[in-house]
Regions:
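Intrinsically disordered, low-complexity terminal regions
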Residues: 1-264
């Protein structure tokens, strides 16, 4: 009997998770204000994800052109358009967008300001604005744009550019920016304190800040099997902004690294 009650409770919880999914492909997900950033995970394949903030506690997920309001044909309306699936996990929400005829629709999220994000897509862009939390974003074929974000950022793109502007940094957590074929363009507040690790294999490094560079130097290795002592060259540049602070790593193979100072 207890087992049946538990299963019934789980079903009720799942049903209550999504308050409403209207004809425009819009899902409202109630969340509680626990005093800690909410965590949202999204994994897409052929779609882009856009995240904006609002003052409420709900998470709103939208896909364009979905639902029974699709265009009519011969007096009939299509009702099998792709939808949004939400799974509540221990550390937050996992949001997915269904495939239809081999295609996946772009996803737009409206979230509370204090939200942590884990966003991944293979063929698509990632665009986030105004979020304060832990932001971890990855795209294979697309660009990453993070505007007026705060907290910590781990961002990577294989075939795209990174453009990031940060209002505040979490001094206790490192930052990482990487791209194989694209520029890395990051704007920090003028009073940022950071220790930098910089590497642009086939590009240039530019900065508005006065960066105190430290020697790259040689890193000692070990004896090989034939008795030769191997020395590994560290090709990274190391430096500090405003005396050093949060650890920030930048790496691009075919692109530039640009570090801007935000205007006051």
């Amino acid at each position: 009997m207890k087992r049946y009650l538990a299963l019934a409770g789980m079903l009720l919880a799942v049903c209550a998770l999504a308050r409403a999914q209207d004809s425009a492909g819009r899902l409202v997900i109630p969340t509680r204000d626990t005093g800690t950033p909410r965590a949202i995970s999204v994994s897409l394949v052929h779609a882009s994800v856009t995240v904006r903030t609002h003052s409420g506690n709900d998470v709103i997920a939208e896909t364009p052109g979905a639902g029974p309001s699709s265009a009519e044909r011969d007096g009939m309306r299509r009702i099998d358009a792709p939808g949004i699936a939400v799974e509540r996990q221990d550390n937050g929400l996992r949001i997915q967008v269904a495939f239809h005829n081999g295609h996946q629709r772009d996803l737009t999220l409206t979230v509370p300001v204090g939200t942590s994000l884990n966003l991944k897509t293979i063929h698509g862009d990632i665009d986030v604005e105004g979020v304060h939390g832990e932001i971890d974003v990855t795209t294979l074929h697309g660009n990453v744009t993070l505007t007026a974000v705060s907290g910590t950022v781990v961002a990577s793109s294989t075939m795209g550019t990174l453009k990031v502007s940060m209002d505040r940094l979490d001094p206790a957590k490192p930052l990482s920016f990487s791209s194989l074929n694209g520029n890395i363009d990051v704007t920090f507040p003028p009073d940022v304190k950071a220790n930098l690790k910089l590497k642009a294999d086939r590009g240039e490094i530019w900065s508005d800040f006065a960066i105190s560079l430290s020697g790259a130097g040689l890193q000692s290795g070990s004896h090989t099997t034939n008795g030769v002592y191997r020395i590994n060259l560290d090709r990274n540049l190391y430096g500090a902004i405003n005396g050093g602070g949060v650890e920030a790593s930048f790496h691009t193979v075919n692109g530039k690294i640009l570090i801007h100072k935000r205007s006051k």
